[in-house]
Amino acid sequence: MHYPDLFDVIVVGGGHAGVEAACAAARMGCDTLLLTQNIETIGQMSCNPSIGGIGKGHLVKEIDALDGVMARATDRAGIHWRILNRRKGAAVQATRAQADRVLYKAAVRALVEKQEHLRVFQTEVSGILLNGETVIGVSSQHKIDFHAKTVIITAGTFLGGKIYVGLNYFVGGRAGDPAALELANKLRDLPFETHRMKTGTPPRIDARSIDFSQMSEQLGDEPLPVFSYLGNVNEHPRQIPCHITHTNTQTHDIIREYIDQAPMYAGVIKDAFGPRYCPSIEDKVMRFHDKTSHQIFLEPESLTTNEIYPNGISTSLPFEAQLKYVHTIKGLEQAIITRPGYAIEYDFFNPQGLRYTLETKAIKNLFFAGQINGTTGYEEAAAQGLLAGINAALRVYDKEGWYPRRDQAYLGVLIDDLITQGTREPYRMFTSRAEHRLLLREDNADQRLTAIGYQLGCVGSARMKQFDAKMTAVAHASDQLKKLLIPADRLSGLTHNTYAAELLKRPEIDVRAVLALANVPPDEYPSDEVIEQIDIAAKYSGYIQRQYEEVAKLQKNRAQKLPVPFDYRKVTGLSAELAEKLQKVQPHDLDQAARIAGMTPAALSLLLIYFKKHTQPLSNSEKGGDCVGEKL
């Protein structure tokens, strides 16, 4: 049967990407339907119960700046908070929260159910409905066809998922949930380049069987941070510590003994690549022979359960091996395993088959987001879902698509890396991937994106009002500091009266220090958020200005637009290899072409000369801007 309503946007999958996609489209006023195998698992944390970290925390802040869900849910669920790289510069400092997975899922569910224009329906999607090369809806296991103007697929690890514990495997999307086999088969029949990836998870352990006295205690940071710009520490639940222990040579000996029963090493998983930056414990042991131990973080999964997530020992080894090696670890000698660790192998599609809006090139109005595009991690998935939701809504309204540049957002770096270079191993975000990371700090994500989001329609008036108030407060406090004169006798080494704004350029002096020198009462200080902005601006102003100048120069040199589509075999002098890569990627400007693997300065010069000679200047409407990406 046909479902009686026509939707603007259908989102397939209720994980982190799906939730952000559905909520973004709904915030923009689209009648949106979220389809999920199980309503009870919306927002479920399938692996590590944590949000944020290096690069990942930046993505969470950007999601929040665009009025997304993840930061707000984490603020309601975070039970252990830390600021990573606190002693380093502001650009690489990152927030990380250990989340109560029960509270997190409940918070996400509440935000989804509160969202206007969003409907949820429980069914397994079995295929997509096409009219020629345009998607018009999806089919389901209940023999119900759902029709929509756009469709976003956020299937996570469920496409053709196989779960391995040793050499034995069973079909599943994650432990306890079925794989989307029929949908995977239907998608493989379409003109998408299909590959396989593998990821894994560690055995879970009963906290009551752990001797924490033999481990190092790791407390959270004080004062407690928040993820959302609208957040408040009063939303946080009770805080608890994590603990640290290590593997040892006995652990490693057992892993080597069973290595021929690890599916990757036995050749059972042949064509799937695992995550480079989150290797299994067997990979660590086999790749790093000289290391006699590896760190393990014992992370509580919830305030209301006894399960512990031992971060650092994800595995595909048989359960017998898991029992043996866990019992060699200090503090885990009597550990009781509640769930075995496992590896999961699943389908993904080459992201080079996507436009920057995350619409597929092969099927009009069909968008992919999350692990289906070759990424790993909740944050990377959520960020893609948000972008796909925005662009699906823009398509519904017949508006041009949007995506951020590399100098605007880590989301821009993520999308550009995927589409320009593709990936064969699970892609995760790091600050090191961003060449303009001084501009892409956690603290200024709202300044980079909130106003743009408001213009696009995905940021609500309440957030925009709060953002405007913050920026007004920053401007007012900055002006006051420019007028505040500090007498020379108030500070050792000061030879003349100096304005506070000048003193702030010194690395050892911050806003609170100059206000104290001026005898300003503490209750008259600006908010912590405002003080942070002023301190960073004062300390890094020269570096930030230099990076803006570098960006402007780069944009000028590489702003040459390229026609899409174009036959690059016409460009005389290009190597066959580069012509083939350009033909596949179809870069929209010289900047994107420059990042294609194997591109040379000589080849870029050829392209620049060729297109300046053979193409007409683009109109202003075609050049794009802060809120314009490519035509959908």
Curated annotation (Swiss-Prot):
Superkingdom, taxonomy of origin: Bacteria
GO CC, alphabetical: cytosol
Which GO biological process categories is it annotated with?
A: tRNA methylation; tRNA wobble uridine modification
> Main location per UniProt?
cytoplasm
Which residues of this UniProt protein bind FAD?
G13, G14, G15, H16, A17, G18
Which InterPro entries does this chain map to?
Answer: FAD/NAD-bd_sf (IPR036188), GIDA_C_N (IPR049312), MnmG (IPR004416), MnmG-rel (IPR002218), MnmG-rel_CS (IPR020595), MnmG_C (IPR026904), MnmG_C_subdom (IPR047001), MnmG_C_subdom_sf (IPR044920)
Which residues hold NAD(+)? Answer: 274-288
- The family this protein is said to belong to: Belongs to the MnmG family.
- What is the recorded name of this protein? tRNA uridine 5-carboxymethylaminomethyl modification enzyme MnmG
**What species does this protein belong to?**
Dichelobacter nodosus (strain VCS1703A)
Gene symbol here is mnmG
